[in-house]
């Protein structure tokens, strides 16, 4: 709060969960922070759907603050959250705020260019290429490029437009390194992907191992 220069934080999100800490311990601490006026609302981030369900049951049973947002791993080339987490959030009226909506750049630049960047370096721990490629990612990347050319926009804007129009997503968390990229992200709100565009982007996707929970 001091760094932000505010008395109350509107939305305080926990960074994943500690499996060794009982849900009620964290939720009681957040409830206390809310009652003392330090936070208004609380959310959480990447976990299994059963873990979120346990958190929600604990809140109801113990009359504690309940999570209102989920910050999860979700983008056009990684959609495993559609299995359980997103339907759960929809049923419980929990806002979805995906982190990494551009998949560390995977759907934001031509596939061949990924290998020529630091993020595409096989020695880079955060190299997303092998993870997303095995789920039909290469073809998804190529289709993002095609639609970007058709719409006269960047690949990143198509990837964001897919997020903006997604029925589950409330507000993707977009990280930028320049004002230009921030402006592009805002401009992507004006892109109207047709139903056939969305189907074209989603059709190559194949289920893949869940990543991003640890």
Positions of the model-derived regions?
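Active-site groove signature of glycoside hydrolases
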Residues: 1-22
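Beta/alpha (TIM)-barrel catalytic core signal, keyed to glycine-rich beta->alpha loops juxtaposed to Asp/Glu
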Residues: 21-203
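A short beta-strand-loop micro-motif that forms or neighbors metal/cofactor-
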Residues: 205-208
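Acidic/histidine-enriched, glycine/proline-rich intrinsically disordered or flexible terminal extensions
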Residues: 212-214
